[in-house]
Amino acid sequence: MVYSRARVRAINIKEKISMLTVKDLVKKYPKSERIAVNHISFEVQPGEIFGFLGQNGAGKSTTIKCLTGILPYDSGTIEICGHDMKNDPIGAKMNMGYVPDNHSVYEKLTGREYVNYVADLYKVSEQDRTERMNRLADLFRLEFAMDRQIKSYSHGMKQKICVIAALIHNPKLWVLDEPMMGLDPQSTAEIIALMREHCAHGNTVFFSSHNLDLVKKLCQRAAIVNNGELIEILDLTVEENKTRLEEIFFKATGTYDERLFIDYAAQESADARPDYVPEQEQKDEKEEETK
């Protein structure tokens, strides 16, 4: 069942505990002089779809790998549902589901075996895992392939089995790194619907993307990062911020071109009047006022 954005916002207000809290996060790779993640801080609330935007090398994937416990970080704190990633990593990870950008799965297993393996790690009961696996496999039209080896899957099918595995324990925080990369429109729509449904039940989705249109359509808020630094967090429920998102993103990444933001509708209207001169129109208006 998919709820309206208003319902999602109501859940945000009702719940007080942040699903994800990042404070002053710093990560530097040993053989690099550049700081990959430079004192980043933000919070993500229950019922929220939160976008994480940036170009390649901006620090998105490094931040996500720190959030998920894959990479150690130099300083700062990460809390998932109140569990500190350094002091209580098991508690933090039990509340999180993760879909990586590289299909890190055991390809010699069948889809069903792999999902059951993940369910065992999270101690999901037989009844719950069966119900969730069947429902998600049906949603993704993947029932026919659940007993085939994953190595025989297409790119989209591998992405779907990763999503099923990430949601098998019904995590409060669902983290996805570039989830729509290489997917066909049908698969993209299915994952979008699932993200909205997950949040409608008071859970949270945190995902990285290059796709500004997708983020504007899907997210309540979005953060823009560049060169390891947090540039800005925008509330995308405010309509004017959807335009600002593009401008801030392109300016932050050094790819801003004012031609991208021309009001072409107004330009076409002017072009349809070859004798139109803005200054002359203003002069004519002043003359009319003095009559």
How would you name each of these model-derived features?
Residues 18-22, 26-39, 89:
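A short, flexible loop at the N-terminus of ABC-type nucleotide-binding domains that lies
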Residues 55-59:
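Walker A (P-loop) phosphate-binding loop of ABC-type ATPase nucleotide-binding domains
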Residues 76-87, 91-92:
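Conserved ABC transporter NBD signature motif
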Residues 116, 120, 128-145:
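Conserved ABC ATPase "signature" region
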Residues 174-177:
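Catalytic Walker B motif of ABC-type/P-loop ATPase nucleotide-binding domains
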Residues 209-210:
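H-loop/switch region of ABC-family ATPase nucleotide-binding domains
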